Swiss-Prot record:
UniProt-listed Pfam families: Lipoprotein_X (PF03305)
Low complexity bias spans: 448-460
Protein name: Uncharacterized lipoprotein MPN_097
The keyword Iron-sulfur is assigned to this record: no
Biased composition (Basic and acidic residues): 480-490
Lipidation (N-palmitoyl cysteine): 23
GO cellular component: plasma membrane
Keywords, sorted A to Z: Cell membrane, Lipoprotein, Membrane, Palmitate, Signal
UniProt-listed PROSITE patterns: PROKAR_LIPOPROTEIN
Location of region: Disordered: 446-468, 480-514
Origin organism lineage: Bacteria, Bacillati, Mycoplasmatota, Mycoplasmoidales, Mycoplasmoidaceae
Chief localization: membrane
Length: 541
């Protein structure tokens, strides 16, 4: 298990790789020469699959007359599905439908090597690739000889993205007054809580001064350009609130002040506590190391206890934490790798004589000690509710760009999702309900002729005048199968006869809404639509 994820993470930073299967000793077999090269792909993204198809089509048009054409074989289940499929085909010696190349992580080469089916990319020109992008081949165990068995073709890395307005509020709340020797300054805020001025200092080194200047600038821009509008709904009425952007008449430092006021509404007031930002010196280099980043995040969480550290349950509209992670394996393994001075000899395993050596994982080994240090750092952060771990299906930035995180680490492939543009809007219910991110997100479709006709009599019989804003479709959750229901009942009743199985064989609850279209209106809801059922009235504020 350690080998699987250890290899996966570092190849993940390099990108996906091509692995070739060949004919050939232990468990070898010859594949049928069908006059084409089969490329297996388990990409789940439609856009990525479409891009790959375009590349293959282009190659097939320009290839040499005697060169084999490439044919894509689609495998379900993502990269794990591709791994399982390859292992199965190798074990049964599939000579006819087995593919020749696969897009996956390079530890699959070890699976091929156990059967003598690995094939080096001898003769392939890799001059345009940095040697550093090929070094992972040196850490593949079980191969017959050192060579390039996998080549990166799609590159991404994990990046740290800061929310400048949130950071400005955090740091500005915690720092000393400029030129003031007083330790604390108290004032009454709107919610009658005591606002405490902190004792934190901001470093004077060049990097820190530049970062603080950038943070101040971005906070000022946020205060000038952004405001959150809220709309009070009538009792028992389900309306939506739009978070919109509107111009503010603020200038100079007032922009940052306006930004802080808005951020405070979400993050609450600063607390001067031991182990927090009290007497702390903030420097830009906290973002250079995992230990520094996690330690700073823990201090921030403790300093905003009313909204972060003391909160046991969170809604989708609440502060989710200080640091957000899209991939916990990536974060864990890279932080352990960094703790070992970025030396593979200090990592979970090392390749020795062509085999994976796990001696580092002994209790007194370097990897064990490094993991223990990293674990203790993360434990302090999780104990203070400062860590947000993405459940999957979306990007952490879904929270961060609405100021619910101070910063996050995610794939560079999702960089574009980290920013809220001028037209970015989020729907928020005012009756204490909400759309939980990231498990439930919907695309809103712009109104067209068909949607306007379906949008009600008011739209079809008169000019629309922009009343219909758009539509989205509700999809019912997948219902349990009879087998799954039976397993659940058996577990709950521990061998006793179930009192009843009313849902077995019946239509799944919620399926009446499957494919149901919800219409969003700006000024009024047509007579043939029902508010909160198939229509929602939205107003900007």
């Amino acid at each position: 298990m350690q080998f699987k994820y250890g290899a996966l993470i570092f190849s993940g930073f390099l990108g996906l790789s091509i692995v070739l299967a060949s004919c050939g000793a232990r468990g070898k077999f010859d594949q049928v020469d069908d006059g084409k090269i089969k490329l297996a792909s388990s990409l789940t993204s439609r856009s990525a699959s479409a891009a790959l198809q375009k590349v293959v089509e282009k190659y097939n048009k320009v290839k040499g007359v005697n060169d084999y054409p490439i044919e894509i074989t689609q495998i379900a289940g993502g990269y794990d599905g591709g791994r399982t499929d390859l292992q199965t085909r190798v074990s049964v010696k599939d000579k006819t439908s087995f593919y020749n190349m696969i897009l996956n992580y390079p530890d699959l080469v070890s699976v091929l090597a156990r059967n003598g089916m690995e094939l080096p990319f001898d003769g392939v020109n890799v001059d345009k690739l940095s040697p550093n992008f090929l070094k992972f081949n040196e850490r593949i165990s079980g191969v017959a000889k050192k060579a390039n068995y996998a080549i990166p073709i799609s590159m991404s890395t994990d990046i740290l993205i800061l929310n400048a307005p949130v950071l400005h509020y955090i740091l500005n709340s915690a720092k000393k007054n400029d030129g003031n020797t007083k330790v604390q300054v108290k004032a009454q805020s709107k919610d009658s809580q005591t606002k405490v001025k902190g004792t934190m200092e901001i470093g004077t080194d060049e990097s820190t001064k530049n970062l603080w200047s950038d943070i101040q600038k971005k906070a000022g821009e946020n205060g000038k350009a952004t405001t959150e509008g809220t709309k009070k709904a009538a009792a028992k009425s389900t309306h939506l609130t739009l978070l919109t952007k509107s111009e503010q008449s603020t200038q100079g430092n007032n922009g940052a002040s306006e930004s802080d006021k808005k951020i405070e509404e979400t993050w609450g007031t600063y607390s001067e506590v031991d182990g927090g930002l009290k007497n702390y010196t903030f420097k830009a280099d906290v973002f250079d190391t995992w230990h520094g980043l996690i330690d700073f995040s823990t201090r921030v969480a403790k300093s905003f206890k009313n909204k972060v550290s003391d909160i046991s349950t969170k809604k989708g509209t609440d502060i989710q934490g200080v640091l957000g992670l899209d991939s916990t394996p990536n974060a864990l393994f890279t932080s352990v790798f960094a703790a070992g001075d970025s030396n593979f000899d200090n990592f979970f395993y090392k390749v020795k004589d062509g085999r994976a050596d796990f001696s580092n994982f002994n209790e007194n080994g370097t990897s064990y000690k490094n993991l223990e240090k990293v674990f203790n750092d993360y434990k302090k952060l999780t104990d203070s509710n400062g860590l947000f771990v993405n459940k999957g299906g979306s990007y952490t930035s879904n929270f961060q760009k609405f100021h619910q995180l101070a910063y996050s680490i995610s794939s560079s492939s999702g960089y574009a999702y980290a920013f809220a543009g001028e037209n970015s809007k989020r729907l928020k219910f005012n009756d204490d309900t909400f759309i939980e991110y990231p498990s439930f997100t919907q695309e809103i479709h712009a109104p067209g002729q068909s949607s306007q006709k379906e949008g009600g009599q008011q739209q079809s019989n008169s000019k629309d005048n922009g009343n219909l804003l758009g539509t989205f479709t509700i999809e019912a959750a997948k219902s349990k199968t009879k087998t799954e229901v039976k397993k659940t009942e058996d577990t709950q009743n521990q061998g006793k006869k179930a009192e009843g199985t009313p849902n077995q064989g019946k239509k799944a609850e919620g399926t009446e809404n499957q494919g149901k279209t919800i219409f969003l209106y700006k000024t009024s809801i047509p007579n043939d639509k029902q508010d909160g059922v198939d229509a929602v009235l939205i107003k900007d504020k």
